Amino acid sequence: GEACHFIDLCSFLADSKVVAVCMNALGENPQENTDNVSILLKYENGTNAVINYFANGSKSYVKERVEVFSQEKVLVLDNWRKLEGFGVKGFSKMTGTMDKGHKRQFALLNERLQKGGEALIPFESIVNTTRASFACIESLKKKAWVEVR
């Protein structure tokens, strides 16, 4: 599903490969409910990431929220429209229109196809995200951490 996009984003922010995952779902029969899950990601460089993917919340709350904690600083991105910084010298808030980067991504892809050059996303990263996604389903079934190989 859509969780792979968030795994990919976390991997980009961590600048590392996922080495283990643990996924837990809500409900009495969680194996059949992947619309309400928490995914824990462990990275090769020691970074941890948590993805909470819930379809049972209020529609009035932001649909997508990213929080990054590092070196006594926090960045919070709400719906790709508002970015707030805490403990970031000289920065507190930025707002704008929603931009998930699709237009720029396709412009860069078109440029690469016409002129050549490196892939926008390294193949190894795509493979790691795919393996991590499959490992999430395995983790849900096993109710345990699963290594990503």
Model-flagged regions — what are they?
Residues 1, 100, 124-127:
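A generic "alpha-helical surface" signal
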Residues 44, 111-149:
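C-terminal helix-rich "cap/oligomerization" subdomain common to oxidoreductases
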Residues 1, 5-82, 103-117, 148:
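Contiguous beta-strand/loop segments that form the cofactor/metal-binding neighborhood of enzyme cores
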